[in-house]
């Protein structure tokens, strides 16, 4: 009886968050409206599981994982949703102070956010000598084409989106330097994890151009 209990405990420890989410997807518990929006952005049904699994595959921090999951399912709090819930007095975007702040507005169509993504594209070209088109689908759901820098690009995009979100919450000023500082802190965190798991050489190979 004791051995059986230990086996069950070990089995539970090995059942990761990633596997749990995969199990949910296998049982078709995904939000239908999320799937519809993904298809509207030009992805195929076969690509949808990759979009759902992206944050679990490349991220280590639970906060960032849940952040991207909320974007996928369009449940990330915005001024618009908070206003509808009567939590805030206005739905106006704190970044541009011009329009209602939906998720799409906050991350993509806001004039301040649009300028931020131009800086991101220029920075990426400078670091990797690659011209990266940041379409609405790429910003929202990630880059899913084969690329040597696939992991770095998607990780950087999620941190960049989080920086936009975090800046808009306290009515702050969105600047690119704050993103770079946040990204460098995250890279240091990933480096520590890689060192502790004896995968430092692999980490340095992946992130070489940003170290």
Predicted segment positions?
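Short linear motifs embedded in intrinsically disordered, charge-biased segments
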Residues: 1-37, 206-210
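Family-specific functional microsites
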Residues: 36-211
